[in-house]
């Protein structure tokens, strides 16, 4: 029978463990602070930002928010970033993507203080990750590692196929899994839209991570017997229901369970972990900036 890896439960445990670290910092006068920056009025982005603010409130992290008009020049956003870089109450912040077309997101990330870059996207933090000295692991890849750990799935010596090469998931996860570490030591294949014979590469993997942003791209015929399947994708597809849509992953769930030994659902798998690891990185940022040691889960 296929094990369903419950991301909600694992994320809840991590949040519970973080509350002790947050209390330690708060008692020392250094309550962690996380800011979100939203440029424009994208409905999905507004939803994500609201969820992150609620997460902060639940664990005792101070939450700050900055709205920037979507028609404002890039310099307006840059000024807000500069102010956050100088704000000692804000230990970490994120600039919610996507930004409007007239703003270069890479330039936005370059302007973020690397010590407050709790997304882990700044070039300095990317370099540290590749070198095996990560300050902040990007939230989704770190969440995937924590899910595997919680399910007692060892990556050492395993063949891992990652479907997707994004800067947010595919690339950093590959770099994390090849590190000489207890949650690494894997042999990793990264596939993408130009990969030939994708199914052959996924079928031979011990662990398949689907992170291509393509609804139900990976089906059961592409999963080897006994493989572990981590579905990072969250896609809206049309459906005959009250909402008019449903959420599906990058994996065709029902057929994949015929072969997989373990699988993450959508929703309720990787998504909650991404949010939990943002809290984790914020607490770590506060610990580093305030020079106060705390135990992290």
UniProtKB/Swiss-Prot annotation:
GO biological process: L-histidine biosynthetic process; methionine biosynthetic process; purine nucleotide biosynthetic process; tetrahydrofolate interconversion
Keyword Oxidoreductase in annotation: yes
EC code(s) of this entry: 1.5.1.5, 3.5.4.9
Membrane recorded as keyword: no
Listed Gene3D superfamilies: Leucine Dehydrogenase, chain A, domain 1 (3.40.50.10860), NAD(P)-binding Rossmann-like Domain (3.40.50.720)
Binding, NADP(+): 164-166, 193, 234
An example Gene Ontology molecular-function term: methylenetetrahydrofolate dehydrogenase (NADP+) activity
Bilayer-crossing regions: none
InterPro entries: Aminoacid_DH-like_N_sf (IPR046346), NAD(P)-bd_dom_sf (IPR036291), THF_DH/CycHdrlase (IPR000672), THF_DH/CycHdrlase_cat_dom (IPR020630), THF_DH/CycHdrlase_NAD-bd_dom (IPR020631)
Gene Ontology CC terms, in alphabetical order: cytosol
Pathway the protein contributes to: One-carbon metabolism; tetrahydrofolate interconversion
Catalytic activity: (6R)-5,10-methylene-5,6,7,8-tetrahydrofolate + NADP(+) = (6R)-5,10-methenyltetrahydrofolate + NADPH; (6R)-5,10-methenyltetrahydrofolate + H2O = (6R)-10-formyltetrahydrofolate + H(+)
Keywords noted in UniProt: Amino-acid biosynthesis, Histidine biosynthesis, Hydrolase, Methionine biosynthesis, Multifunctional enzyme, NADP, One-carbon metabolism, Oxidoreductase, Purine biosynthesis
Listed HAMAP family: THF_DHG_CYH (MF_01576)
Protein purpose: Catalyzes the oxidation of 5,10-methylenetetrahydrofolate to 5,10-methenyltetrahydrofolate and then the hydrolysis of 5,10-methenyltetrahydrofolate to 10-formyltetrahydrofolate.
Alphabetized PANTHER family for the sequence: C-1-TETRAHYDROFOLATE SYNTHASE, CYTOPLASMIC, C-1-TETRAHYDROFOLATE SYNTHASE, CYTOPLASMIC-RELATED
Subunit structure: Homodimer.
Family stated for the protein in its record: Belongs to the tetrahydrofolate dehydrogenase/cyclohydrolase family.
Record protein name field: Bifunctional protein FolD
Source organism of this protein record: Natronomonas pharaonis (strain ATCC 35678 / DSM 2160 / CIP 103997 / JCM 8858 / NBRC 14720 / NCIMB 2260 / Gabara) (Halobacterium pharaonis)
């Amino acid at each position: 029978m296929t094990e369903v890896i419950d991301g909600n439960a694992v994320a809840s445990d991590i949040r519970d463990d973080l509350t002790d670290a947050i209390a330690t910092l708060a008692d020392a006068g250094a309550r962690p602070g996380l800011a979100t920056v939203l440029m424009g009025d994208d409905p999905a982005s507004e939803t994500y930002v609201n969820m992150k603010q609620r997460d902060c409130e639940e664990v005792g992290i101070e939450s700050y928010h900055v709205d920037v008009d979507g028609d404002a020049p890039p310099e307006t956003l840059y000024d807000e970033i500069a102010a956050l870089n100088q704000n000692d109450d804000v230990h970490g912040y994120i600039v919610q993507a996507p930004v409007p077309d007239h703003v270069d997101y890479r330039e936005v990330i370059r302007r973020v203080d690397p010590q407050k870059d709790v997304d882990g996207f700044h070039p300095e933090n990317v370099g540290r990750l590749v070198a095996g000295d990560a300050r902040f692991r990007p939230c989704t890849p770190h969440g995937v590692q924590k899910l595997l750990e919680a399910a007692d799935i060892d990556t050492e010596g395993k063949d891992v196929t990652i479907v997707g090469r994004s800067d947010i998931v595919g690339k950093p996860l590959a770099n994390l899994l090849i590190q000489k570490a207890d949650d690494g030591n894997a042999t990793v294949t990264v596939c993408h839209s130009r990969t030939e014979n994708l199914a052959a590469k996924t079928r031979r993997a011990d662990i398949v991570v689907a992170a291509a942003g393509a609804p139900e791209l990976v089906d059961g015929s592409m999963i080897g017997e006994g493989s572990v399947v981590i579905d990072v994708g969250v896609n809206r597809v049309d459906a005959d229901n009250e909402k008019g849509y449903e959420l599906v992953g990058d994996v065709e769930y029902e057929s994949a369970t015929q072969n997989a030994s373990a699988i993450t659902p959508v929703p309720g798998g990787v998504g909650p972990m991404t949010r939990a690891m943002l809290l984790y990185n914020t607490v770590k940022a506060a610990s580093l900036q305030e020079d106060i040691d705390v135990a992290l889960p």
